[in-house]
Amino acid sequence: TSGGVEGMVSVRQLITKMVSGLTSNDLTSLKKYLDSDESTIADDATSIEYSYSVSPQIYRQDPDGSVHQVNPDSTLSMLGLGSSGSGSTSVTSSLMNSMGSNTSVFYQLPANSDLYKSQYEVKAGRWPEKPTECVAVLSKYGTVTDYALYSMGLRDSAELDKMIQQFAQNQNVDVPSDFRTYSYDELMGLKFKLVNSADTYVYDDTYGIWKSKADDKDYMQQLVENGEDITIVGIVQPDYTASASMLTSGIAYPASLTEKVMKLSLIHISEPTRH
């Protein structure tokens, strides 16, 4: 209501108007409403962000031809620590609790760049301009995590695998002590490979089923080899004058990459790979 009684707080009907008349979980209609001129949510929000349960399948290809999935990171599951057994679950939980949110090196940037760009200083390169470009985000101290080094291929991932195995088996962990600093040039231009997750399945005409080829080493190496390059084109660090910083340390890709992945999946459904 307009006006109001002095000393009293009135209620502005925002969410109730938004959802009234909408079918429960009718997300299509909800998004249509939010994007329409009828919506008043823009009066109270800086930006409207949409998130999807889609995570780009990103791989690192080493010089010897071997491939490693770095997003979503498969390190723990590949070592048998992601199974349902109580022992492995306990180990995984312990690792996750110790590392916090840092188990995910890659993440999506907010679609609205105005939300974060002013908070950061570009130390090298630039912000992503294409879906297949990403940026290395440093901490306010100008650091990256050791975990990120393994994902980027700047340290041998076998070293990480060994440490996790030792930890899981309650052995003394051989922790490396030879960490060094890295120049911006060593991070700039690092490349990863984008794989359409749907392409890890092929359709078997004989049995009429989709078969996973994720465990087929040769198939996956070829699939990754043919994947699009994802390239680090910039390095950013929180500006010392910023009162807050939205992004976390890691490798951030644009929202347009998520949209690209969804479109690729739809194409695969209409034109399946047959075997």
Residue spans of the language-model regions?
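Hydrophobic, regular-secondary-structure patches
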Residues: 1-132
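Hydrophobic secondary-structure segments that place a key small or acidic residue at a functional site
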Residues: 23, 98-261
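Short, solvent-exposed coil/turn linker segments
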Residues: 75-77, 182-183, 272
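Residue-level detector of conserved catalytic or cofactor/ligand-binding positions
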Residues: 267-275
